[in-house]
């Protein structure tokens, strides 16, 4: 079983958005995950804001400690049958379900503790964490773990609304 974890616990304060950007962007991310053929479950990690979500959620009381704390909350909430977690960000509205499937299929074929999509050689999301990697998630989250990269150059990167263009 492979579960997706959507990190949506942040305060959304960088650009003073109101209502929280998670409310606007989450439906796009969740729709992309539901179109992916390789996922069995989706979990959204919330924290700073109460956000309406069409799906399963967990609240992270330590969300202010950063993405690692939010990711650990999500990992702890997954069922014992989960072999791996596919991590995505709530503020990546252009997530392509083909990238999700590509990362998962690469992990199934070649294994590895951490497998991430790369666009133009740059590591982005989604990032798959095999259960063996879960105990080692640092405070900065999955980006603090070395990953095997999967080429997604032919796909649009997931975007990040926190990056001004």
Model region roles, listed by residue range:
Residues 14, 52, 93-94:
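A short, conserved beta-strand element in the Rossmann-like catalytic core
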Residues 7-9, 45, 88-89, 117-118, ...:
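Short beta-strand segments
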Residues 54-62, 147-150:
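Active-site regions of enzymes building and remodeling cell-envelope glycoconjugates
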Residues 1-49, 100-101, 105:
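N-terminal glycine-rich phosphate-binding loop and ensuing alpha1 helix
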Residues 134-165:
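Conserved alpha/beta core of the MobA/IspD/sugar-nucleotide pyrophosphorylase nucleotidyltransferase superfamily
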Residues 64-131, 135-136:
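Conserved beta-loop-beta/alpha segment of the NTase-like Rossmann-fold superfamily
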Residues 17-24, 58-69, 94, 98, ...:
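Residues at secondary-structure transition points
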């Amino acid at each position: 079983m492979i579960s997706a974890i959507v990190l949506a616990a942040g305060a959304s304060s960088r650009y003073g958005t109101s209502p929280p950007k998670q409310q606007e962007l989450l439906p796009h991310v969740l729709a992309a995950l539901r179109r992916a053929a390789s996922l069995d479950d989706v979990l959204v990690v919330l924290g700073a804001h109460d956000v309406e979500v069409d799906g399963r959620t967990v609240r992270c009381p330590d969300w202010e400690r950063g993405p690692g704390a939010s990711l650990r909350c999500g990992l702890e909430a997954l069922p014992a049958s989960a072999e791996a977690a596919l991590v995505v960000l709530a503020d990546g509205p252009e997530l392509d379900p083909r990238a999700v499937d590509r990362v998962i299929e690469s992990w199934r074929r070649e294994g590895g503790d951490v497998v991430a999509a790369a666009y133009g050689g740059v590591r982005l999301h989604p990032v798959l964490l095999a259960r063996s990697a879960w105990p080692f998630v640092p405070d900065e989250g999955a980006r603090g773990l070395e990953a095997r990269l999967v080429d997604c150059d032919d796909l649009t990167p997931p975007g990040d609304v926190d990056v001004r263009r």
